[in-house]
UniProtKB/Swiss-Prot annotation:
GO terms for cellular component: plasma membrane; proton-transporting ATP synthase complex
Listed SUPFAM superfamilies: C-terminal domain of alpha and beta subunits of F1 ATP synthase (SSF47917), N-terminal domain of alpha and beta subunits of F1 ATP synthase (SSF50615), P-loop containing nucleoside triphosphate hydrolases (SSF52540)
Membrane recorded as keyword: yes
Family per similarity comment: Belongs to the ATPase alpha/beta chains family.
Species for this entry: Desulfitobacterium hafniense (strain Y51)
Catalysed reactions, semicolon-separated: ATP + H2O + 4 H(+)(in) = ADP + phosphate + 5 H(+)(out)
Keywords from the named record: ATP synthesis, ATP-binding, Cell membrane, CF(1), Hydrogen ion transport, Ion transport, Membrane, Nucleotide-binding, Translocase, Transport
Protein's recorded name: ATP synthase subunit alpha
Amino acid sequence: MNLRPEEISSIIKQQIERYDSAVEVVDVGTVIQVGDGIARVHGLEKAMSGELLEFPGGIYGMAMNLEEDNIGCIILGKFTEIREGDQVKRTGRIVEVPVGEAMIGRVVNALGQPIDGKGEIKTDKFRPIENTAPGVVYRKSVHEPLQTGLKSIDAIVPIGRGQRELIIGDRQTGKTAVAVDTIINQKGKDVICIYVAVGQKASTVAGVVKTLADHGAMDYSIVVSATASEPAPMLYIAPYSGCAMGEEFMYNGKHVLIIYDDLTKQAAAYRELSLLLKRPPGREAYPGDVFYLHSRLLERAAKLSPDLGSGSMTALPIIETQAGDVSAYIPTNVISITDGQIFLETDLFNAGFRPAINVGISVSRVGGSAQIKAMKQVAGQLRLDLAQYRELAAFAQFGSDLDKITQMRLTRGERMMEILKQKQYEPMVVEEQVVVLYAAVKGFLDDIPVDKIKSFEEDYLRTMRTTKADLLAKIRTEKALNDELNAEIEKAITEVKEGFLG
């Protein structure tokens, strides 16, 4: 093969023209100390607060403390694989998680990586875990109900789409059960549910996932898990990751329900990180910005205005108290951020009243605007009767000679408390709740023995679902009670009662 000299020179010229002399400039630092999920890095003068940093071996960290001569950063992964002297690169980005439809039905860790053994998640959408909450002008007042399927909540402390309602109580009072029941009740209601498990045992999270799968709820749910065995940084970012996944749907006009189970453990993880980063401790050794930790998370839940697509994100944060002390630091913080709270009590739980909701001190600051009119019509009387019952029950312990009216109110109150009991994983549709509570508030249960109330309720609902299905359908479509519907309900109750009492 003969090459002419002019050809050789033209090839060399082309190669010279193609040569790219650009140099990639990377800001690099050095690890000077590492341990307990924290690394101190020297040499990254231009790093920003919250910036994602890259360690060797594909491990990432997040800059938290920007000090004069070094950076304190939290390590999002196995910190045991990082050594002193390792190089650290800036990325110029903040922590992002994968989002979108591909996440539904999956169990992921705090970084959005799958941990359910079902293969990788195919999505090209990512969102930063920290995001500004929608402003006042971009919100609409909460007006659509989000049904939990639990009579005591839907009637007395109703939750609306876009609301933040705290679930608070001691350990083993059924807080997670209320949240899981609410997720199960969203089936067929076009609501995407996100369950964020923070600091739970891996076996507990596996149990929740199995329950959701058994009830067909994983078809519209995402589970974000940061278990107790994971480093504190993962527990700290997990709620923000779950929130970012929810925001993707909310800003696309969809409705989202997100459960943070529980924020007490997130606060403890943040306290651990803050103390390791040598930040000054405050009350109960929490850092000064622990209020901001929760407020910036919960403020991202909203009901958006029609201009932004009318989507919503409803948040149900869970807080665990110690011996019923709701005046501790974290419980008071979260109570002041949220739009109401559902108190669960150990005494009620142990007495067999489940869900163990104290309807006296549980409140919803959204109130009746998050209820259909039919529920509002029966719930108003229910709330009043229960308040009178609690007051009279306290006095009745001291005296036996009670007048007839007092006796009647106590009788009705006992039956109302009984009718509010509900089995786990058996959420009830709103029209069935209305007809059951109607029977209680109108005094139809007064002459039925308390121990027979639950079996009467079962008979009554069986009749309603079979022979009176059209009546339930009317309540569902009209969403309000009128004289005609009231008469039909009363007729049905009387018929069932005659058969029940013989």
